Amino acid sequence: MASQSQGIQQLLQAEKRAKDKLEEAKKRKNKRLRQAKEEATADIDQYRLKREADFRRIQTSVMGSQGNLAVKIEEQTVEKIQFYSSSYNKYKEGVLKELLDLAYNIKPELHTNYKYKI
């Protein structure tokens, strides 16, 4: 009986050691997962910072050239407004005279395709 009791004790101790090893393995696994997550987060943050810096650099280069474009567009707009204004003043009288002539000098005549029937 003592040998059975001793065998049972050995089995219980072996079971306890196995359970302890499993718990230890779970702890190591959780620790590795946390560490991997922290490393991944650090890598992601570093990548994000790099991409944001690249974006800002590109944005400033584009916005800087857009500022120059805005000035050029403004100059071209002023030039076109002046051109159209001078053209308006130059041709205003002639166009108005033509329109009034067309309105006042009416020559009634039949259309060429009209066929008169009696």
Swiss-Prot record:
For the biological process aspect of GO, one term held by this record is: synaptic vesicle lumen acidification
Pfam families referenced in this protein's UniProt entry, alphabetically: V-ATPase_G
Keywords of the record: Coiled coil, Hydrogen ion transport, Ion transport, Transport
Q: Name one GO molecular function term.
A: ATP hydrolysis activity
| InterPro entries per the UniProt record, alphabetical | V-ATPase_G (IPR005124)
Please tell me one Gene Ontology term that the record gives under cellular component.
vacuolar proton-transporting V-type ATPase, V1 domain
Residue span of region Disordered:
19-39
UniProt key word rRNA processing: no
Per the record, the domain of life is Eukaryota
Stretches assigned to coiled coil? 3-54
> What role is this protein assigned?
Subunit of the V1 complex of vacuolar(H+)-ATPase (V-ATPase), a multisubunit enzyme composed of a peripheral complex (V1) that hydrolyzes ATP and a membrane integral complex (V0) that translocates protons. V-ATPase is responsible for acidifying and maintaining the pH of intracellular compartments and in some cell types, is targeted to the plasma membrane, where it is responsible for acidifying the extracellular environment.
Record-stated family: Belongs to the V-ATPase G subunit family.
State the oligomer form and interacting partners: V-ATPase is a heteromultimeric enzyme made up of two complexes: the ATP-hydrolytic V1 complex and the proton translocation V0 complex. The V1 complex consists of three catalytic AB heterodimers that form a heterohexamer, three peripheral stalks each consisting of EG heterodimers, one central rotor including subunits D and F, and the regulatory subunits C and H. The proton translocation complex V0 consists of the proton transport subunit a, a ring of proteolipid subunits c9c'', rotary subunit d, subunits e and f, and two accessory subunits.
- Protein name per Swiss-Prot or TrEMBL: V-type proton ATPase subunit G 3
Organism from which the protein derives? Xenopus laevis (African clawed frog)
